[in-house]
Amino acid sequence: FGAAVIGRVLEAEGYRVAIVPQPDWHGDFRDFKKLGRPRLWFGVAPGCMDSMVNKYTANRRLRSEDAYSPDGRHDLRPEYPTIVYSQILKRLYPDVPVILGGIEASLRRLTHYDYWQERFRPSILCDSGADMIIYGMGEKAVVEISNHLQMAIEDGNAHLNYAEDGTARVGMKTFRDVITHGHCIPQTVFIYNKEDIPGGIVPDDLILHAHETCLKDMKAQAENFRHIEEESNKYHAQRIIQPTGGRYVVVNPPYPPMTQDEIDHSF
């Protein structure tokens, strides 16, 4: 499972990791609060299968069991858990960065067709309120992000919050300064205002049809899909930018493929 692998990778780098599996999203959200505010960031990864495929059949009937839940229970995760969990975390901890990962976020990083709702939806960053996506294999990105934030704390450059025990905790200002606008980390997705895009829009960027154009023209979405798939399979991909709702979804190119030693280290 991805969350377990990512947790072990971060532990190997010296970070302390807590995993809350299938938190209860009803009532007082106690599962989201039981471990308190994290020092660096929240990660949301709703599973190794798309949640809607896991919950419903192709005929849109509720599946009788969930193969990835205790006792096969199918009521332990909501529909679109990435969106539900992220919105709850932002409501409870608005100043803590929320990072999305896993197949659900990766497949929805740009305009996409939702089979269940029969309509095009924008990047999941728009619906969830999260701060960034790590798409694909996330081992390198989570370590790089965490290291940059840790270095900002150690250098005294961070806008910090402090726990009762004096532990420094990263807030959104630090995250924006160090990650969103400071380092161009591969395999990540952000939403920017045009003037805030790192380096500005350059000729090498691949500019997709705007989300609003795709809503009116299915051929525009088909062209976007072809470009996205082509760039996903290139060794040296372009940065992808899509105008969405007056802002810009920016997809940074992926890391080079992991070497055998790197894969062995992760697993």
What label would you give each PLM region?
Residues 11, 125-126, 267:
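Alpha-helix boundary recognition
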Residues 5-17:
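Short helix-loop-beta junction
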Residues 7, 122, 263:
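Short glycine-/small-residue-rich flexible loop motifs, especially phosphate/cofactor-binding loops
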Residues 2, 21-244, 251-252:
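Glycine-rich beta-alpha loop elements in corrinoid/cobalamin-binding modules
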Residues 258-267:
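Long hydrophobic segments that form regular secondary structure
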Residues 5, 245, 262:
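Solvent-exposed, flexible loop/coil residues
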